[in-house]
């Protein structure tokens, strides 16, 4: 399907209105998954011409994303990735977990950006950065599109490796679904129950009464850890 290639229009506007010299594009992946982290990439591209075929990662085939990923990592001025774990998502909620992952990505950059272009309509990042939210920014903004591809390839590989390396995860087909809803994923949940890599605050668990107790166990353990001054987190 034909698509309009992303441009530097938003970045140029942000530079002109804020005086920013370094602008980072930020995008996330994994928001709607049942398992695995939410991952954020921050990418600084400058105003150079992008590699051919760059667009929102969701519009690209897995093969094309894999081809573009090393090209983009070499082409961008800088990039960094940040993750928030399933436990952090359960503890904090998705909005705060997104901010945590984004801060980790931005603080991982070798240069501090003066401003940020954030994909979507909600500013989950906030101060101290100057933020411009752009709906479908991963399709229209070059830096955000680059971040979307790098984040997607990184997280997909992470989930595939998790599925291959962990016996507990073998039946969930993470290599194919990356932790997102799928018939195979649902069937494995019904049979085996969620793993330590699943988000227990997600609504899917409401349809699995056999495993409801795991939600209570995790959150009871975390509440006890907080009361004792310990660290949040629980492993099954």
UniProtKB/Swiss-Prot annotation:
It comes from the Bacteria. The keyword GTP-binding does not apply. One of its GO terms (biological process) is DNA replication, removal of RNA primer. GO terms for molecular function: manganese ion binding; RNA binding; RNA-DNA hybrid ribonuclease activity. It is found in: Cytoplasm. Residues 21-214 form the RNase H type-2 domain. Its EC number is 3.1.26.4. This is Ribonuclease HII.
């Amino acid at each position: 399907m034909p698509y309009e290639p992303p441009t530097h229009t938003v970045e140029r506007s942000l530079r002109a209105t804020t005086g920013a010299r370094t602008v980072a594009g930020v995008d996330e992946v994994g928001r709607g998954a049942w398992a695995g982290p939410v991952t954020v990439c921050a990418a600084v591209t400058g105003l150079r011409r992008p590699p051919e075929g760059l667009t929102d990662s969701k519009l690209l085939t897995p093969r094309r994303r894999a081809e573009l990923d090393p090209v983009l990592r070499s082409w961008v001025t800088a990039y960094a990735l940040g993750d928030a774990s399933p436990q952090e998502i359960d503890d904090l909620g998705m909005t705060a977990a997104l901010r945590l992952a984004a801060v980790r990505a931005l603080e991982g950059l070798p240069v501090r950006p003066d401003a940020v272009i954030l994909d979507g309509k909600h500013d989950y990042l906030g101060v101290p950065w100057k933020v411009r939210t752009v709906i479908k920014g991963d399709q229209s903004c070059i830096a955000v599109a680059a971040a979307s591809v790098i984040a997607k390839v990184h997280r997909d590989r992470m989930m595939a490796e998790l599925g291959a390396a962990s016996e507990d995860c073998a039946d969930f087909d993470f290599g194919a679904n990356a932790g997102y809803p799928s018939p195979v994923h649902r069937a494995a949940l019904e049979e085996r129950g969620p793993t330590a890599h699943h988000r227990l605050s997600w609504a899917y668990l409401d349809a699995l009464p056999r495993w409801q107790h795991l939600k209570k166990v995790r959150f009871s353990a975390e509440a006890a850890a907080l009361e004792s001054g310990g660290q949040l987190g629980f492993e099954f």
